[in-house]
Regions:
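Short, Lys/Arg-enriched N-terminal segments with co-localized hydrophobic residues
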Residues: 30-46
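Glycine-biased, low-complexity coil/linker segments
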Residues: 3, 18-19, 32
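N-terminal catalytic cores of NTP/NDP-binding nucleotidyl/phosphoryl-transfer enzymes
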Residues: 62, 67-125, 233-240
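A charged helix-plus-loop insertion that forms the helical arch/lid used to bind
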Residues: 125-141
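Divalent-metal (Mg2+/Mn2+/Ca2+)-assisted nucleotide/phosphate chemistry catalytic cores
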Residues: 56, 136-137, 143-262, 268
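Conserved nucleotide- and phosphate/pyrophosphate-binding catalytic cores
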Residues: 250-453
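Short hydrophobic targeting helices and cationic amphipathic motifs
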Residues: 16-17, 28
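Methionine residue identity
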Residues: 1-4, 40
Length: 453
C-alpha cells in the first residue's frame, strides 16, 4: 500500500502469509516430509537469522527483503518496536514482539523499545471499531514503569545494548504549526483514507484526534532514525500502513532508506487471536496472571496449535522441534508440557516454571500441591457464617461474574472438596475454609485452594 503523495515510491512488499492454505491443518505425512526437507537444507547450508525467522513462521511481510536480510544477519540493525502503555502490564499479545527483540539482540542487533507515552494520549484506531479511552499522564507514567520491569526479562538494557525510549519526549513538545509545515505536507489525505486502519472506522466515525495517529507514528520512526540511527521497524500487520508512512517520511525528508517488517499474528487454528481466556487477557505480570495460570494457559492449547506455538515462541532449536512434527496422541500432551514450561521459564524464571509444572502434575495425579493457586474470602463474604455456591465460585476467581458462576454450577462444572455441587443454593460453613482451606474446582483444569482471610 502506498501511503504518501504522488512521487513517493511504494515499498517492495514480500508477503509470507500466503493464502488460506497456510492455515489448513497438515496431515501427518506432509509434516514428516516437510521436516525432512528442512533438515536436509540445514545440513547443506548454515541457516541465517533471517532464514530462521522465516522457518519459525514469524515474518508476515517486509519492504526490502535483501536490505533487511543484510541488516539483521550481520548485526547492523538498530530496530524498534512500539508499545502503547494502555494497561499496567504487558500481555500475551506482546509476547511475539518481545521474543523477536530477544532473538535479534542475541544476534548482535540493537533493540529500541519505544514506549508510546505520547501516542497513548491519542489512542491507536487500528483494529478498533470505537474510540479508545484516553488515559491521564499519571496513568500512562505508571504503566510505563510497569513495562520497564517486565521488558527486562527479555531485553538486556545494560551497557547501551538496548534503549528504552518514550515518544512523549518529542511528541508532547511539538509545535502544531511546525508539525504541519515539516510533516503534514508529506502526507496525502486521500491515500491515508485508503489505509485499512481507517477504512473500518469511517462508518462509525473517526475523530480528527485519531486520524493523526498515522502521522505521529511515522514521526516516531523519523525521530528515531535521526536520534539513534534506527533503520528498521517491526510491528503487527494492523500497523503496516503506519509503518510504511514512516519509511516514506524518512525517504522524503532525509533521502535515506529505512525498512519495515510485520510480525505474524499469534492465531489459533480457528483464526482467533491467542492470549484470551474466559477471565480476560493472559498477562505477563504475576499479580494479574499467576505463573501457574500462565503455565496452564499454554498447557491447555489445542492440539492443532501446540507445535506452531513451540516453533514461534520458544528458543528450542528448530532441529529439536522438527522431530515433534510427527508427534500425536499422548506425545502432543508432552509437547504442551514443553511449551508451557519453556514460556513460563521465559516470563517468570526457571524456579516459578518448575513450581507451576510440579503443581500441575500433583493436581492431575490426585496429590497435594503446595503451589496451587489460592484465593482468600473476606469475612463479609459470609452470611450467618455461611457462603452460597455462587458467591464461592465468584469469590474464588473462577468466574468473572455471578451470572457466569451460576451457569457453571448449573452445568455441573463445579466441585468443592471433591464433591460436585448440583444446587446453586448450596451453602458452605465458614469453618470449612479455615486453616489450609478447601480446593474448589471448575471443569477439569481450573483449581483454587480457598480459605478465609
Amino acid at each position: 500500500m502506498q501511503i504518501m503523495n504522488n512521487g513517493a515510491r511504494s515499498a517492495e512488499v514480500v508477503n509470507y502469509q500466503g493464502s488460506g492454505a497456510a492455515k489448513r491443518r497438515r496431515d501427518l505425512a506432509y509434516k514428516v516430509a516437510r521436516a525432512a526437507i528442512r533438515k536436509m537444507k540445514r545440513e547443506e547450508t548454515k541457516m541465517t537469522l533471517y532464514d530462521e525467522l522465516v522457518a519459525r513462521g514469524l515474518i508476515a511481510q517486509v519492504t526490502d527483503e535483501a536490505l533487511i536480510k543484510d541488516l539483521i544477519n550481520n548485526g547492523k540493525a538498530t530496530f524498534y518496536i512500539g508499545f502503547d502503555p494502555t494497561a499496567d502490564s504487558l500481555h500475551v499479545g506482546h509476547f511475539m514482539a518481545l521474543c523477536l527483540m530477544k532473538r535479534l539482540q542475541m544476534a548482535g542487533n540493537k533493540p529500541i523499545a519505544l514506549i508510546g507515552g505520547g501516542t497513548a494520549m491519542i489512542g491507536d484506531p487500528s483494529g478498533r471499531t470505537d474510540m479508545r479511552k484516553m488515559l491521564t499522564p499519571e496513568q500512562i507514567q505508571h504503566n510505563v514503569d510497569c513495562f520497564k520491569k517486565q521488558m527486562a526479562r527479555f531485553i538486556d538494557f545494560s551497557d547501551d545494548k538496548a534503549l528504552l525510549v518514550n515518544n512523549a519526549d518529542w511528541l508532547l513538545n511539538l509545535n502544531y504549526v511546525e508539525l504541519l509545515r515539516e510533516v503534514g505536507a508529506c502526507f496525502s489525505v486521500n491515500n491515508m483514507l485508503r489505509a485499512e486502519c481507517y477504512k473500518q472506522r469511517m462508518e462509525k466515525g473517526l475523530s480528527f484526534l485519531e486520524f493523526n495517529y498515522m502521522i505521529m507514528q511515522s514521526y516516531d520512526f523519523y525521530m528515531l532514525y535521526q536520534k539513534y540511527g534506527c533503520n528498521l521497524q517491526f510491528g503487527g500487520n494492523d500497523q503496516w500502513s503506519n509503518m510504511l508512512g514512516g519509511t516514506e517520511l524518512i525517504r522524503r525528508k532525509l533521502d535515506k532508506d529505512a525498512s519495515a517488517m510485520t510480525i505474524t499474528l499469534l492465531l489459533n487454528s480457528e483464526g482467533k487471536k491467542m492470549g484470551k481466556t474466559a477471565s480476560g487477557a493472559v498477562w505477563l505480570d504475576p499479580d494479574k496472571t499467576s505463573p501457574y495460570d500462565f503455565y496452564q494457559y499454554w498447557r491447555n492449547v489445542d492440539d492443532a496449535d501446540v507445535l506452531k506455538c513451540i516453533r514461534m515462541l520458544t528458543f528450542l532449536p528448530l532441529e529439536e522441534i522438527d522431530k515433534m512434527d510427527s508427534w500425536e496422541g499422548a506425545q502432543l500432551n508432552k509437547a504442551k508440557e514443553i511449551l508451557a514450561y519453556e514460556l513460563t521459564k521465559l516470563v517468570h524464571g526457571e524456579e516459578e516454571a518448575k513450581k507451576a509444572e510440579a503443581t500441575a502434575k500433583a493436581i492431575f495425579t490426585g496429590g497435594d500441591a503446595a503451589n496451587m493457586p489460592t484465593a482468600k474470602l473476606e469475612a463479609d463474604s459470609f452470611t450467618d457464617d455461611e457462603i452460597d455456591a455462587i458467591n464461592l465460585v465468584f469469590g474464588a476467581g473462577l468466574a468473572t461474574t455471578k451470572s457466569e458462576a451460576r451457569r457453571t454450577i448449573q452445568q455441573g462444572g463445579v466441585s468443592v472438596d471433591g464433591e460436585k455441587v448440583a444446587d446453586i443454593a448450596a451453602k458452605f460453613p465458614k469453618s470449612m475454609f479455615e486453616g489450609d482451606g478447601v480446593v474448589v474446582k471448575k471443569g477439569k483444569k481450573s483449581f483454587v485452594k480457598v480459605s478465609v482471610n
